[in-house]
Amino acid sequence: MLLAIDNGNTNVKFALVNQAGAIVQRWRLATDIKRTADEYAVWLNQLLEMEGYTRADVDAVVIASVVPRAVHNLQELAAKYF
């Protein structure tokens, strides 16, 4: 599955997209440029597990952002945990 991350000024939105292109799960978190990759990972891992998924189910990550200062931590999240 694809993990799509949309980083906006107010919220960071996460969606799991299956092979058919359908969104099977979505979550939202308040944007905070101080939030670390590790913090994102703990939060996201818990939500994945609550819905019956694991990080191993994610084959790829795509990030869209209008908050340049927050991109680095999201890129680190993708590289380190997926």
What does each model-found stretch correspond to?
Residues 2-44:
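Short glycine-rich, Thr/Ser-proximal phosphate-binding strand/loop in the N-terminal lobe
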Residues 40-56:
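A short, N-terminal amphipathic alpha-helix
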Residues 51-82:
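Short beta-strand-loop/turn "lid" adjacent to the catalytic site in phosphate-handling enzymes
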